[in-house]
Regions:
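Acidic, low-complexity/disordered tracts enriched in E/D and polar residues
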Residues: 1-42, 46, 92-99
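Long, charge-rich, low-complexity alpha-helical segments
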Residues: 33-99
């Protein structure tokens, strides 16, 4: 399971996409598979245009849709895990340093 507190995420370079009426269509250029995102998925996808911390994604999602943190966390982790399985994003783990 993805840990949002010590990971950051970015779009894979082999994916192209377009947005229509708030929804997005993604095309994985190597596999030729298309994916459709609803407006919430589109918001997350747009934020992945640069490497972004999982906690920052969670904050945006929670604030935009006024949902409880645990619900937003579950939905975000599910989406990011699906993106990762399909090769649509890269995940960067951060080492946690203790003093």
């Amino acid at each position: 399971m993805i840990d949002l507190t010590c990971s950051s995420f970015a779009r894979a370079t082999n994916v192209t996409w377009r947005t229509f009426d708030g929804n997005s269509i993604l095309l994985h250029l190597e596999s030729g598979v298309y994916y459709t995102l609803n407006p919430a998925g589109t918001l997350i996808w747009e934020l992945l245009d640069r490497r972004i911390a999982g906690q920052d994604l969670l904050t945006v999602l929670r604030d935009r849709y006024s949902v409880e943190e645990e619900e937003a966390r579950r939905d975000l982790v599910d989406l990011l895990e699906e993106f990762a399985r399909e090769g649509l994003i890269s995940i960067h783990e951060h080492e946690i340093k203790y003093r």
